[in-house]
């Protein structure tokens, strides 16, 4: 596989650590490499709105925010309902109305679940499957030069 540049590495776009979601701050790059720390998924939507992440980053942040939502529900920090899970996805989809890829991807992710238990059990694996698909595309593009 072609090693992706900094701006395309998943851990540098968004990652979860110590109960927080960290989003790579594209506004500061290339002068500095820093992250914006997010405490709830609605802050992730605000970060996308304010340009913390750009290009394909909003989609990846939205996907990681769905895993983060699962984590917060497990920790009792968000209401344990399917409506909470779906509501986060809808709020993320709404922040960039012209980003139809983000909306379609989140809709496809949600359509796989009929209840909260399914979502909680499968969201992380499903998100990583989607990200692996992006990796394959980036690899093919990288081979083309």
Q: Over which residues does each language-model region extend?
A:
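Small/polar-residue-rich loop-to-helix segments that shape phosphate-bearing ligand pockets
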Residues: 102-145
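Long amphipathic alpha-helical segments
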Residues: 3-120
